[in-house]
């Protein structure tokens, strides 16, 4: 049950007041000031989101009660930690990111379980497994610049995060900071499962994530996400193709990159180098003819049968002209129930 004081503050925070009342709100404990925030604490009557300042829309500027509590803990704002806990924030989340003994004691006095070892990893995995917008945002806020991560097995954590998402988070495990890895992890999970509120939140709070959004869309073979991302990201078509070729059966991403002007012969060789043979045959369908180089590469990989097949002069190409603005609907329609033409050609050749 809320205390009388917390109830009174809840009523005040749920209403709108003129700037003349701001000094009273500061005295009343409904003001939040730090490096990025400076304004009255308000609560949306419709979605229970916390808003700080004079913003009319909680979708762009609001935060859940748990996220507000987590940020208050990181700010060492004792009065707001107590208030948000009374209003329904989960103090256990606050305890997981308390970075001083005094703040840890405060969280425990408010009912938090003392965090221990595996609890941090269990929470991280749980919040990403629920596939819920708010849980991904909670996870990001808890572990963003969390000192406890200085004491975890870094390589083990990187491997776990990489295995949990279908999208490559980095080029090499040892060439990315943990903070950036976690940011990419939360973002990749949001894009992978189309959690739009989480994507919107991360776009507003994590700098320079638009190029990674495009990488995710290419890897996930989603022409509509690719099309949207290309409106704000200027990436070289050959770089896009390189990403598309890393996952087999990524025909829509390959076709989109090809239509933008990516080199289809390079794509054929990249696909073979990654061992993604369906992609390689699709590139041949689109007009790739680097058969000599591909045959040599197949020989180096000890794929003798493939090397022999690539030496046959039987392949046909379906040339699709490049265009500046590919249509994702057209791409999806072209590839609906698509069968690899030149794989069928090979079967016909050997079954004569």
Curated annotation (Swiss-Prot):
Protein function: Plays a role in virus cell tropism, and may be required for efficient virus replication in macrophages.
Keywords: Early protein
GO terms classed as biological process: taxis
Induction data: Expressed in the early phase of the viral replicative cycle.
Top-rank taxon: Viruses
Protein family according to the UniProt entry: Belongs to the asfivirus MGF 360 family.
Organism: African swine fever virus (isolate Pig/Kenya/KEN-50/1950) (ASFV)
Protein name, entry field: Protein MGF 360-16R
InterPro entries: ASFV_MGF360 (IPR002595)
A Pfam short name: ASFV_360
């Amino acid at each position: 049950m809320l205390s009388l004081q917390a109830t009174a503050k809840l009523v005040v925070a749920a209403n709108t007041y003129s700037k003349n009342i701001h000094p009273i709100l500061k005295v009343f404990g409904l003001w939040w000031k730090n490096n990025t925030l400076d304004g009255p604490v308000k609560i949306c009557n419709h979605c229970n989101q916390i808003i700080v300042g004079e913003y009319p829309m909680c979708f762009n500027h609001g935060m859940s009660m748990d996220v507000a509590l987590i940020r208050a803990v990181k700010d060492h704002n004792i009065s707001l930690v107590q208030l948000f806990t009374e209003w329904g924030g989960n103090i256990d989340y606050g305890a997981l990111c308390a970075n001083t003994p005094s703040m840890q004691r405060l969280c425990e006095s408010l009912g938090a379980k003392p965090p221990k070892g595996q609890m941090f990893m269990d929470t991280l995995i749980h919040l990403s497994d629920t596939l819920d917008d708010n849980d991904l945002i909670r996870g990001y806020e808890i572990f963003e610049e969390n000192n406890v991560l200085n004491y975890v097995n870094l390589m083990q954590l990187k491997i776990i995060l990489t295995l949990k998402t279908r999208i490559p988070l980095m080029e090499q495990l040892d060439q990315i900071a943990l903070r950036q890895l976690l940011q990419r992890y939360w973002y990749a999970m949001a894009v992978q499962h189309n959690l739009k509120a989480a994507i919107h939140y991360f776009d507003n709070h994590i700098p320079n994530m638009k190029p990674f959004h495009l990488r995710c869309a290419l890897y996930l073979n989603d022409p509509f996400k690719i099309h949207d991302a290309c409106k704000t990201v200027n990436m070289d078509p050959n770089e896009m193709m390189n990403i598309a070729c890393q996952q087999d059966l990524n025909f829509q991403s390959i076709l989109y990159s090809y239509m933008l002007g990516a080199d289809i012969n390079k794509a054929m060789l990249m696909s073979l180098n990654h061992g993604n043979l369906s992609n390689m045959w699709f590139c041949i369908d689109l007009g790739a003819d680097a058969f000599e180089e591909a045959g040599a590469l197949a020989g180096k990989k000890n794929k003798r049968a493939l090397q022999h097949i690539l030496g046959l002069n039987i392949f046909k190409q379906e040339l699709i002209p490049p265009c500046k603005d590919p249509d994702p609907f057209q791409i999806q329609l072209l590839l609906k129930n698509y069968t690899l033409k030149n794989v069928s050609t090979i079967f016909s050749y050997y079954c004569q």
